Design a protein with these regions (language model features):
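Conserved ABC ATPase signature
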Residues: 136-140, 144
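ABC ATPase NBD coupling module
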Residues: 68-84, 113
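Short helical segment in ABC ATPase nucleotide-binding domains corresponding to the A-loop/adjacent helical element
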Residues: 99-107, 117, 121
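Helix-to-loop junction immediately C-terminal to a conserved catalytic motif
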Residues: 51
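A short, proline-enriched helix->beta-strand linker immediately N-terminal to the Walker B motif
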Residues: 155-159
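Catalytic Walker B motif of ABC-type/P-loop ATPase nucleotide-binding domains
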Residues: 161-164
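Conserved ABC transporter NBD signature motif
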Residues: 59-67
């Protein structure tokens, strides 16, 4: 069964640039897929469409059981709970500790505090950075920042995990 189903998707920006032109992709649950191409090919727009940061102009798009063409604004946070994203620049919050950066992803979806503490410590253990729980992003190496971004992306047990430039 497809976890991502994109059919004839078109995305044009206001400046006239067409970022996606008739894109059709089907990705099954448990499948790994790589989107490759030169700069400006639309890879980032493709990713941003998957978690509804950008709206598509034409076509159909289903992600983790959500119809992203018809999704209501109030349902977007629940979609994003099911789509974990590791951003190219990590997007860590500089004034928050490692713990707070990861916990924030659970707080915004209304998770209980006791569940947050337990789960944050589990994912920190998983990425091997429990000892950095009180550190701030600027105190971490690039690789450690990436692992914190991964921990944040998986803390809500998403159905889909997306990594933008994962190298």
């Amino acid at each position: 069964m497809s976890i991502i189903e994109m059919r004839d998707v078109v995305k044009k920006y206001d400046n006239g640039t067409t970022a996606l032109r008739g894109v059709t992709v089907s990705i099954d649950a448990g499948e790994f897929a790589y989107i490759v191409g030169p700069s400006g090919a639309g890879k980032s727009t493709f990713i941003r469409a998957l978690y509804r940061e950008v709206k598509i102009d034409n076509g159909s798009l289903q992600v983790a059981g959500y119809n992203l063409v018809k999704i209501k604004k109030k349902d977007v946070p629940m979609l994003r709970r099911n789509v974990g994203v590791v951003f190219q620049d990590y997007k860590l919050l500089p004034k928050k500790t490692v713990y707070e950066n990861i916990a924030y992803a659970m707080e915004v979806v209304g998770e209980r505090r006791r569940n947050i503490k337990k789960r944050v410590m589990e994912v920190l253990d998983l990425v091997g950075l429990k000892h950095k729980v009180r550190s701030f992003p600027n105190e971490l190496s690039g690789g450690e920042q990436q692992r914190i971004a991964i921990a944040r992306a998986i803390v809500n047990n998403p159905k889909v995990l997306i990594a933008d430039e994962p190298t």
